[in-house]
Amino acid sequence: MQCVKLPVSVTVEINVLLLAVTALALFTRLYGIHFPKAVVFDEVYYGQFLSLYMKQVFFIDESGPPFGHMILALGAYLGGFDGNFVWNRIGAEYPGNVPVWSLRLIPALAGSFCVPLAYLVVVELGYSHFSALGACALLLMENSLIVQSRFMLLESVLIFFLLLAVLSYLRFHKARNSFFKWFWLVICGVSCAFGIGVKYMGMFTYFLLLSLAAVHTWQLIGDQTLSHGKVMFQVLVRFLALVVLPVIMYLGFFYIHLTLLYRSGPHDQMMSSAFQASLEGGLARITQGQPLDVAFGSQVTLRTVSGKPVPCWLHSHKANYPIRYENGRGSSHQQQVTCYPFKDVNNWWIIKDPGRQSLVVSSPPKPVRHGDIIQLLHGMTTRYLNTHDVAAPMSPHSQEVSGYIDFNVSMPAQNLWRVDIVNRESEKEIWKTILSEVRLVHVNTSAVLKLSGASLPEWGFKQLEVVGDKIYKGYQQTGMWNVEEHRYGRSQEPKERELELKSPTHSDVNKNLTFMAKFLELQWKMLTVKNEESEHKYSSSPLEWITMDTNIAYWLHPSSNAQIHFIGNIVTWTTGNITLVVYCLLFLTYLLRRRRKVEDIPQDSWEQLVLAGVVCLGGWAVNYLPFFLMEKTLFLYHYLPALTFKILQIPIVTEHLYIHVLRSSAQQKAFGGVILAVLCSVYMSYHSLSPLTYGQPALTSDKLAELRWRESWDILLRKR
């Protein structure tokens, strides 16, 4: 019982330096984040989606997966934001009901914690706490990172998860076999999933870590001290944590996203009819009570499965193709058939049995099956859908599609079409409303009814061209159609049938669509549907990022010279470029000399330098070079993940030079003086640019002109 008398004690180690830099980071990122109380640059973009999120309205953002929006929505939810604000312009004042501080809080916290994470990464790479402190100092005083952290933007959140993923993998790699070894591996997989879930750019660092893990796993396989069972276990756990877990989490983001956003929204028409029908208040409103099976006599609207260039419906109207086109080619002068991107009474067609004259559904209904031959009669003009060996107006390599008019010339009707249900489960599959994807094949010519994507001239009312494609091969969404609105025709009399076509369909049901079907469709749309790219005043090329030849004006006060710019610490950016070159020269020199059996540094220092290069130089490269291949509008802030890894490289190269290259005490003292001078210059640059970083105080025009350190920088000066 003597042990009971002993005091219970707990020993806790506190890294005071780490706590200090974390506190400083929180101060630099959180100080005055409610200012300005106005929309700042891309807040106008993310804010629109945030409002839709708060109202649980479906939307598509092709810029990235939904997890980033969920994070911003969490801040909005905690602040009590109801989504009622119109995000229509940069500089718009936030009313009192918009919790500005809460909306900007999570990005600011993420940006703050990037600083201690950088400290831990440098230490985990095997470098001194002094070097880690240097990395923190550079990040603390990096104006561009501060600006991007202080507003409702996602780059700081992305960088936080990337650094956490790198730190977790390094700790896993260095840990001995224990619970914490596998804990860090799981954290790495989770962080990678979060990073990718915020922005697709997270894939770059994920692939870097996967490559590093593959190399380490290959070395593990060659370890003869491990049994086959242990090797298999190690490989399996790595695969589960770094591949399977991120995939499951990525799917989970979309599952939550689609569960939360269940209401019809502004982007519905980009999705398939089945997807739209699954949203509350959207297509479901007009599809309730529709017959599921398409039958002879059915009145239908046919929507193209493809969303390119826009979703549209098979359409015809009382206007003919011109006798001759502008280029002198002749047409059939038949009635125009187009694809129209709006709901209209002229989108209705009647599916007719070629062997019967009746235009109504029989009792019982005779369903249309895969392989059946049909005629399509335009409901309002009673012209049959027709194609023939006449060149289409905008796509002369394809056949013209028309509503057949008998001009008493040697041009007989060719209006028979074969129904090919592409997603059928059996050869006798019945054509289903919304669910079936159908290819309509012309019986006479084997041409497929297809949306060409071209727009007709003024004579075609700028509607989209529909053609008969004789060289159609494989699965092409432009040649797939589905029945969206559907009713059983009941009237044989033309006047009564016209009234029937103009009457609304029934109202409010959900069509069941599995999560995986919705996920695959949404993911495909996000990757393929792009908004029209337009030149932006502040867009830039990756070559301009290296030397920061550009900046971005984020906000300007409506009456004073107070303004906020995305602009970096020019001393840090220049130093980073120099250390990248120095690292490459060092690496190549060591590599060539080691090839000649000359070892300038110990083996463990060489391995340390290589690993640091893979993480930092590799992190910079994978987050920078891919932008040269992208055809999209790019901005300077896209460089931030690469910049972060480049900054980590600076103290690493500095320490290596100090210890392994500069041998004498005099050289080291002189180099120490250079380091101190650079840090002072970094601070002076940060301090000078801080009015443009924080937006206050407002400077005079003369002071602003003095901050234009490069001719290419766009500093805003008010005209007197």
UniProtKB/Swiss-Prot annotation:
This is Protein O-mannosyl-transferase 1. Widely expressed. Has particularly strong expression in testis, ovary, brain, liver and heart. Keywords: Endoplasmic reticulum, Glycosyltransferase, Membrane, Repeat, Transferase, Transmembrane, Transmembrane helix. Transfers mannosyl residues to the hydroxyl group of serine or threonine residues. Coexpression of both POMT1 and POMT2 is necessary for enzyme activity, expression of either POMT1 or POMT2 alone is insufficient. It catalyses: a di-trans,poly-cis-dolichyl beta-D-mannosyl phosphate + L-seryl-[protein] = 3-O-(alpha-D-mannosyl)-L-seryl-[protein] + a di-trans,poly-cis-dolichyl phosphate + H(+); a di-trans,poly-cis-dolichyl beta-D-mannosyl phosphate + L-threonyl-[protein] = 3-O-(alpha-D-mannosyl)-L-threonyl-[protein] + a di-trans,poly-cis-dolichyl phosphate + H(+). One of its GO terms (biological process) is regulation of eye photoreceptor cell development. Disruption phenotype: Morpholino knockdown of the protein results in developmental delays at 18 hours post fertilization (hpf). At 48-72 hpf, the tail is slightly curved and somite boundaries are also abnormally curved. Swim bladders are incompletely formed. Glycosylation of alpha-dystroglycan (dag1) is severely reduced. Disulfide bonds: none annotated. Gene3D superfamilies: 2.80.10.50. It is found in: Endoplasmic reticulum membrane. Residues 291-354, 365-422, 426-486 form the MIR domain. Pfam families: MIR (PF02815), PMT (PF02366), PMT_4TMC (PF16192). One of its GO terms (molecular function) is dolichyl-phosphate-mannose-protein mannosyltransferase activity. Its main location: endoplasmic reticulum. InterPro entries: GlyclTrfase_39-like, Glyco_trans_39/83, MIR_dom_sf, MIR_motif, PMT_4TMC. It comes from Danio rerio. One of its GO terms (cellular component) is endoplasmic reticulum membrane. Pathway: Protein modification; protein glycosylation.
